[in-house]
Amino acid sequence: MRTISLIVLIAGISMLMLISLKTQAQTPTDGFAMSKGEICLVTDYGQTTWKEYWEGTRLRENLNLGTFQSNMIMPMAGYGLNNRLNLFAELPYICTSSTAGQMTGMKGWQDLSLSAKYKLIKKKNDQGTFYTFLTAGVSFPVSNYIPDFLPYSIGLGAKTLSGRVILHYEHKTKLFATFQTGYTLKSNIETDRQSYYNEGQVNSNEMPVPDVWDGAFLLGFNNIRFRVDMHYNWSTSTSGSDIRPNDAPYPFNKMDAQWIGVSGLLWIPGVKGLALHASADQVIAGRNVGKAFTWTAGVQYVFNPFKKSAQ
């Protein structure tokens, strides 16, 4: 028997197997923005591992699977089209494996995500500054991977359309708080199976993938040298079925998760725009997902090739 992998959508774009890979670079889901002409280049490496998983709401192990592991490299690019609108592109490469059993993991390029973040409101007073951002995004597979081979699949194979609202407040003491939430629509997919379970047998090879509502709360500190935060995230499928006892998972399963974590960013002295960032997250509650621990680390470089040097 196979178990379910941790498949949680962050931030409104398709990030399967690895949670909370949105570290402290400028991203579509945070409360920070690039100025006009700025380019942000990011490369992240991350790893997720889990041994226990929720079969429905029951937490259990599977000795035939052992410890499941997913590794990911994700390049990302961001561009400040103007002082209000930022554009982003991301494409993760994922490799999956387990320590027991006879199943072979999968690897490859997953889904290309394209998104835009718009600064709708900026209000400043003597105590701090309040921002409201709106984010919209799409994603689609770029390789012919198999989605119905969980937990080893590198993705669910669905095209997505997402929208998000971000509320961000920065106090004059450099403390900040962020709340963001979004909804992701997912397309149906075609599988090799001829039927699946949805409160009864459905005789079709076309399978719906549940939409997702997700969000996060962050509290942190940000200055010109470094940034740190602690966060709580959730992701909830709006439909789907539970993994049945002694049955294999599939993309229509209802996948819910809550996780907590910390992350940070350090600007490198002497190299303008260069920073290192890292994060660590632990799933604390779930449904049809792995009880996973995820860590990530990466490097980012922010520069403006169009800005004229001061005379």
Where do the protein language model's features map onto the residues?
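Short loop/turn motifs that connect adjacent beta-strands in outer-membrane beta-barrel proteins
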Residues: 29-37, 84, 122-131, 173-174, ...
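Surface-exposed strand-loop-strand hairpins of Gram-negative outer-membrane beta-barrel proteins
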Residues: 47-72, 148-153
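Outer membrane beta-barrel transmembrane domains
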Residues: 54-63, 201-311
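Transmembrane beta-strands of outer-membrane beta-barrel pores
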Residues: 45-51, 91-97, 120, 138-144, ...
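Outer-membrane beta-barrel architecture
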Residues: 36-42, 86, 90, 109-113, ...
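Residues that define the transmembrane beta-barrel architecture of outer-membrane proteins
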Residues: 37, 69-73, 107-114, 130, ...
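Residues on the lipid-exposed face of transmembrane beta-strands in outer-membrane beta-barrel proteins
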Residues: 43, 75-79, 89, 114-118, ...
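Outer-membrane pore/translocation modules
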Residues: 102-207, 249
